[in-house]
A protein has these predicted regions:
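Short, hinge-like loop/turn segments at secondary-structure boundaries
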Residues: 55-59, 88-89, 130-132
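Structured helix-beta-strand junction loops
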Residues: 34-36, 64-68, 91, 109, ...
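Short, well-structured N-terminal submotif of metal-dependent ribonuclease cores
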Residues: 1-40, 50-63
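Active-site neighborhoods of divalent-metal-dependent phosphate/nucleic-acid chemistry enzymes
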Residues: 69-116
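Acidic, PIN/NYN-like endoribonuclease modules and their adjacent C-terminal/linker elements
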Residues: 30, 103, 107-132
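A generic structural signal for short hydrophobic patches within well-formed alpha-helices
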Residues: 10, 45-48, 120-121
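Generic structural signal for small/hydrophobic residues in well-ordered secondary structure
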Residues: 6-7, 48, 81, 106
Length: 132
């Protein structure tokens, strides 16, 4: 099964100073990468590349991320994301547009989601997202 890796995981994995708590997450990402199971949404790629101060670092990271295919999105992905947002909001659960798009894309394709963002655990109470 392919896995949508969320920005929170990429941020941990790409930090210069890795904390001990991040090592298991980094190891899982490494395994998923070597198995060819990692896919990206363009918006996650964009978030990962935001705020890179030095051009050389930006280019190096951009080129590294190009190894991972972007998922082509359809109108149905956006519509389902809106439906998920509305369902969660009506149950008092908040989330970002990007988070609900990740859930919709993963659900429609049978992918799992790899994230450290605890909001996704709240989403699971109301929508069918599959966390790794």
């Amino acid at each position: 099964m392919n896995v949508v890796v969320d920005t929170s995981v990429w941020s941990l994995a790409l930090r210069r100073n890795t904390q001990n708590g991040a090592i298991p997450i980094i190891n899982i990402l490494r395994d998923l990468t070597s198995d060819g199971r990692v896919v990206l949404l363009g918006v996650i790629r964009q978030e990962v590349l935001y705020g890179i101060r030095y051009t050389e670092q930006f280019i190096r990271l951009r080129d590294y991320l190009r190894a991972f295919p972007d998922i082509e999105l359809t109108s149905e992905d956006y519509e389902l994301a809106a439906e998920f947002f509305n369902t969660c909001r009506s149950n008092g659960v908040q989330g970002s547009n990007t988070d609900f798009l990740i859930c919709a894309v993963a659900h429609r394709r049978g992918y799992s989601i790899f994230t450290t963002d605890k909001d996704f655990e709240n989403f699971q109470l109301h929508i069918p997202d599959v966390l790794l």
